[in-house]
């Protein structure tokens, strides 16, 4: 249909139908079954990896919390490396390479050169223009990121000394408060700005107010109902995974689900009572309320306007968790409302989360696009991954990779 002159709405529907699949299965049924088998095995391996610490088997969710809160560099390096060895990395690499081969065939069956081109076609512009636009936008933000990187590196050097973190060059990935160094939000104590006045600690506010995980989600729901939106359905509370199950391992990465395109909305998240997760809950419910908003659309339009729109909605809501909002919901006493002298601290907290994430996101897609185009071979996966991480993020692993 690409060469047909279709009405704009019909052409958009056809593009959603053709390119709206993350991993397209080939027409061959055996290959399609194999693709499903591979993705299931990799997902299960990723979510069920355990690491022994002090005689106890610790899961990924707890390891994430350790990375967030510990300031012991030897222990951080041990946890960082141990989690990456908790599943079979060689098998994961082999499975991933086979998945790439099969999914690329599925993309070719749909008329694309490869899966990278298919993914890049979902942003209302030609694939090559989208890739160039990503680099253009990153070029605008990169100088600010470099300044943030320099500031955080200097503070880490002051905290740990030259032997752990050099005053110049890349930052050790395990010191950045996150298993993937994709958000540095938990480093607010390390990256504090001396010129700034007193702010607040959202972790402490939640604990002092006696919040539990469900109350965090209820508060996020109230954000939306205060705007005139209908409350979430009872099934949301019955069917969502809000806390980590005790009887099984699950993938704890936060996600929002639209199960029936009517009103069966859910989240899946191993929520902890801390500021990061409080913001994330608002982000995830942003997805849910957006999903509900388009459930009345034609079936092929029951999705995000394009592949970037859902995350824009989620983060727009997350950025609304401001001091003024915390006062409105009673978490922050109005007398403790930070004045203008605290603006630097609040802006730094935002930068540690949002600005620090951007080179990770660009690097991740650059690696995937190059893998899918065959520019990075399976034998080069790890080497090129870390080359891109150092180039974009300015980070290096704490152990040999």
Where are these regions (language model features)?
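Active-site recognition of the HExxH zinc-binding catalytic motif
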Residues: 272-294, 311-319, 367
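Zn2+-dependent metallopeptidase catalytic core
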Residues: 133-152, 206-233
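Short beta-alpha connecting loops at secondary-structure transitions
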Residues: 266-268, 298-305, 343-352
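Catalytic zinc-binding patch centered on the HExxH motif and its immediate surroundings
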Residues: 66-67, 222, 242-264
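Long, amphipathic alpha-helical stalk/connector segments used for oligomerization, subunit docking
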Residues: 323-401
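A well-structured
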Residues: 1-204, 398-399
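Post-HExxH zinc-binding segment in Zn-dependent metallohydrolases
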Residues: 134-144, 304-342
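Short pre-active-site segment immediately N-terminal to the catalytic Zn-binding motif
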Residues: 207-212, 262-282
């Amino acid at each position: 249909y690409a060469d047909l002159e279709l009405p704009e709405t019909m052409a958009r529907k056809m593009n959603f139908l053709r390119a709206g699949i993350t991993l397209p299965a080939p027409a061959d049924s055996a290959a399609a079954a194999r693709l499903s088998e591979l993705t299931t095995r990799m997902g299960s391996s990723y979510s069920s990896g355990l690491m022994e610490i002090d005689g106890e088997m610790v899961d990924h969710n707890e390891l994430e919390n350790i990375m967030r809160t510990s300031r012991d560099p030897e222990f951080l390096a041990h946890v960082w490396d141990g989690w990456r060895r908790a599943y079979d990395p060689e098998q994961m690499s082999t499975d991933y390479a086979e998945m790439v081969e099969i999914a690329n065939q599925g993309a070719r069956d749909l008329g694309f050169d490869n899966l990278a081109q298919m993914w890049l076609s979902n942003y209302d512009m030609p694939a090559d223009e989208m890739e160039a636009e990503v680099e253009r936008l990153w070029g605008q933000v990169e100088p600010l990121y470099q300044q943030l990187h320099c500031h955080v590196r200097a503070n880490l050097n002051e905290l740990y000394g030259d032997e752990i973190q050099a005053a110049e060059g890349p930052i050790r990935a395990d010191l950045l408060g996150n298993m993937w160094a994709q958000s540095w939000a938990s480093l607010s104590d390390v990256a504090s700005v001396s010129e700034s006045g007193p702010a607040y600690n959202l972790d402490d506010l939640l604990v002092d107010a006696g919040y539990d995980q469900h109350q965090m989600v209820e508060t996020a729901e109230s954000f939306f109902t205060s705007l005139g939106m209908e409350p979430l359905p009872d099934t949301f509370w019955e069917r969502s995974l809000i806390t980590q199950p005790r009887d099984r391992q699950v993938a704890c990465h936060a996600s929002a689900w639209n199960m029936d395109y009517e009103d069966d909305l859910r989240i899946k998240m191993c929520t902890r009572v801390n500021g990061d997760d409080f913001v994330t809950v608002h982000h995830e419910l942003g997805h849910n309320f957006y999903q509900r908003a388009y459930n009345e659309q034609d079936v092929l339009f029951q999705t995000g306007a394009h592949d970037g729109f859902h995350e824009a909605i989620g983060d727009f809501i997350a950025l609304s968790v401001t001091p003024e909002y915390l006062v409105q919901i009673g978490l922050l006493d109005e007398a403790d409302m930070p004045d203008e002298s605290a603006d630097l601290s609040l802006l730094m907290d935002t930068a540690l989360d949002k600005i620090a994430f951007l080179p990770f996101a660009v690097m991740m897609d650059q690696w995937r696009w190059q893998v899918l185009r065959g520019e990075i071979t399976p034998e080069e996966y790890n080497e090129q991954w870390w080359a891109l991480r150092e180039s974009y993020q300015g980070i290096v692993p704490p152990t040999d990779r």
